[in-house]
């Protein structure tokens, strides 16, 4: 399909493989990767957490090389600095000990669960979460329960939001220790109390919830 589209639009097509990745080391805040494409890119620091960002960055580097082939001047330093400073609000975004992620569908919640289990395996975690009623599914409940020892639910600021108490009850039915908060501010305060000095707060769910939380935390949109 991609080959047909590229031929139709007279666009260059480049196929990449896992062999392109020479070295990769992921951590909770990003990754350091070395690639071999048309040139070698050594120790590229990625500011976006998540193993999938390694392949995304590989596509970026392939695009840079193609643009250079077409005559664009793009210094190596600009590429390294760009990847090291890239931000994506509410996508595995850290604010101190709070990890914010707009995981609002089964795939997103499973990816978040995998991330915290791989990168924060020995870290006590508290989940602060709010979802839309028409988005929540059974497998999401199971994965949310696996993310944290304690869960605080809130009602997102949206007409389609799932009531915090109803959400907490559903999580409890899946074995979680969950409680509902009357507001985002109350929920954040309770999550911080439960977290104490040693736990990470994972804040996940609807993008409406994540956006409101970012505003409450004073994070800039850029």
What are these regions (language model features)?
Residues 1-43, 61-77:
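Acidic, Mg2+-coordinating active-site environments of NTP-dependent enzymes
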Residues 22, 209-211:
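Short, active-site-adjacent cap segments at secondary-structure transitions
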Residues 1-14, 29-31, 98, 106, ...:
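C-terminal helical cap/extension that packs against the catalytic core
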Residues 206:
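Active-site-proximal loop/hinge segments that shape catalytic or ion-binding/gating pockets
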Residues 5-27, 46-51, 78-85, 103, ...:
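Beta-strand->loop->alpha-helix junctions that form or flank phosphate-binding loops
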Residues 38-150:
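Nucleotide phosphate-binding/pyrophosphate-handling subdomain across enzymes
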């Amino acid at each position: 399909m991609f080959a047909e589209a590229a031929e139709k639009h007279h666009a260059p097509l480049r196929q990449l493989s896992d062999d392109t990745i020479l070295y990769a080391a992921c951590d909770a805040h990003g990754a350091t990767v070395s690639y071999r494409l048309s040139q070698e890119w050594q120790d590229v620091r990625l500011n976006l957490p998540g193993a999938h960002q390694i392949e995304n960055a590989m596509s970026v580097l392939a695009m840079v090389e193609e643009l250079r082939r077409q005559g664009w001047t793009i210094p190596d330093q600009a590429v390294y600095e760009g990847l090291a400073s890239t931000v994506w609000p509410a996508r595995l975004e850290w604010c101190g000990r709070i990890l914010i992620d707009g995981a609002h569908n089964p795939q997103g919640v499973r990816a978040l669960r995998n991330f915290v289990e791989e990168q924060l395996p020995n870290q006590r975690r508290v989940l602060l979460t709010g979802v839309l009623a028409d988005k929540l599914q059974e497998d999401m409940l199971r994965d949310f329960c696996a993310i944290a020892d304690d869960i605080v639910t809130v009602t997102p600021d949206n007409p389609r939001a799932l009531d915090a108490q109803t959400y907490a009850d559903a999580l409890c039915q899946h074995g979680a220790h969950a409680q509902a908060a009357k507001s985002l501010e109350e929920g954040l305060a309770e999550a911080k109390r439960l977290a104490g000095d040693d736990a990470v707060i994972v804040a996940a769910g609807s993008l409406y919830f994540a956006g409101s939380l970012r505003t409450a935390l004073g994070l800039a949109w850029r």
